[in-house]
Regions:
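Auxiliary Fe-S-binding modules of radical SAM enzymes
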Residues: 2-45, 54-56, 255-341
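N-terminal [4Fe-4S]-dependent radical SAM core
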Residues: 2-118
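Hydrophobic faces of well-ordered beta-strands that scaffold small-molecule active sites
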Residues: 56-60, 117-119, 150-152, 176-180, ...
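Structural recognition of alpha->loop->beta junctions
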Residues: 78, 140-147, 234-249, 321, ...
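Core AdoMet radical
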Residues: 84-104, 108-131, 146-159, 175-201, ...
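Generic structural signal for well-ordered alpha-helices
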Residues: 98-105, 134-139, 164-168, 203-206, ...
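Acidic (Asp/Glu)-rich catalytic clusters
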Residues: 108-112, 137-145, 167-175, 207-211, ...
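Conserved C-terminal portion of the radical SAM core fold
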Residues: 200-260, 277-300
Length: 341
């Protein structure tokens, strides 16, 4: 794609990606304002484009653990990961999948009526179990009439062939997304956060998932200790250029949560964390680097406020989103502005 200096503000045309019935492919050759009016391809816009209505994600707990917690690779997990396995907002695992879905629906009932949902298995590593355990769990979620898609958070080193085959079968019934927690491409940073696998493991997992026609979403943390801004942009650029193409990305502000190893390190020797303005500046640079057709599933993320140690400003999500939207609009920047391939 040729780099362009045009700004989205000079292009009032609204871009509507091709619907599932049009048979046409989206034209991402020029910077556009997407269907929700934003200059980046938000998850909300993509969901509405695909399903014709607003879709909510329901966080579920499959009752699994993680090889980085059960002693296979380690016992403490990644240093940023809470005791809830990054699924602090998920429904409790001691209830059935259907019961979890209904409880989660009730929590958002004031926001959506007669809607559809993404069943999101979020806590810990959701393919770290035998297929005999996973299949009834995921099948129950997909069978729910209000579930439009299944999303599974996992590690790239926990996708054996029989699990990939299961996910491919489920994907023929309803869309299946696989969310991989990469966080960084830099091996020193990966060792520092105790990620527990090397970059080639991630690369191989993405290739196998894409070969199975599964949707791949990658999590990145911005603000890891001792990483420079240039290194963070290198991670985003790497994902932007990766082949086969990655479908979606989550850009996650580093949250320091009480009860994690990261919080212990921060309290012993505080390290710099982003101010809101610094984070927004970096976020806009990331958006410019991403290909126009990559869906941005997240631009900051949330942690339980009762556990949040830093950065303090991230408690006020509304203030952040308003400030970010204003800064992005005034910058004239748009997704894909600096993307070349």
């Amino acid at each position: 794609m040729k780099q362009t200096t045009q700004t989205y503000l000079s292009l009032p045309e609204t871009f509507h990606p091709a619907s599932t019935t049009s048979g046409k492919q989206p034209d991402f050759s020029m910077p556009r304002c997407y269907s929700d009016g934003r200059p980046y391809y938000s998850l909300n816009a993509w969901l509405k484009d695909q399903f014709g209505q607003k879709i909510y994600k329901l966080a579920l707990d499959g009752g699994m653990t993680c090889p980085n917690r059960d002693g296979t690779l380690g016992t403490g997990g990644c240093i940023f990961c809470s005791h809830g396995g990054s699924g602090d907002f998920a429904e409790p695992a001691h209830t059935s999948v259907t019961e979890q879905i209904e409880a989660a629906k009730a929590r958002v009932a004031n926001k959506i009526k007669d809607g559809k949902y993404v069943a999101y298995f979020q806590s810990y590593t959701n393919t770290y179990a035998p297929v005999s355990y996973l299949e009834p769990l995921f099948s129950e979620a997909i069978a729910h009439p209000d579930v439009a898609a299944l999303s599974i958070g996992t590690r790239p080193d926990c996708l054996p062939p029989d699990v990939l085959e299961l996910l491919a079968r489920l994907n023929r019934r309803k869309p299946v997304w696989v969310e991989l927690g990469l966080q960084t491409i830099h091996e020193e940073s990966a060792a520092r956060i105790q990620r527990g696998y090397s970059l080639p493991v991630f690369e191989n997992a993405v290739r196998e998932l894409k070969a199975a026609d599964l949707t791949v979403i990658v999590h990145v943390i911005l603000g890891l200790p001792d990483e420079t801004k240039a290194q963070m942009l290198d991670t985003v650029r790497y994902l932007a250029d990766f082949q086969p193409a990655i479908d979606g990305i989550k850009l996650q502000l580093l949250h320091i949560l009480r009860g994690t190893k990261l919080a212990e390190l921060y309290e012993q020797a505080p390290f710099p964390v982003f101010s809101m303005d610094e984070y927004i500046e970096l976020l806009i640079e990331c958006i410019r680097l991403l290909p126009p057709d990559m869906v941005i599933h997240r631009i900051s993320g949330d942690g339980p406020k009762k556990l949040l140690v830093a950065p303090e400003w991230s408690r006020n999500k509304r203030a952040f989103l308003n400030t970010f939207s204003k800064a992005l609009r005034e910058s004239g920047c748009f997704q894909g502005q600096d993307f070349t391939n």
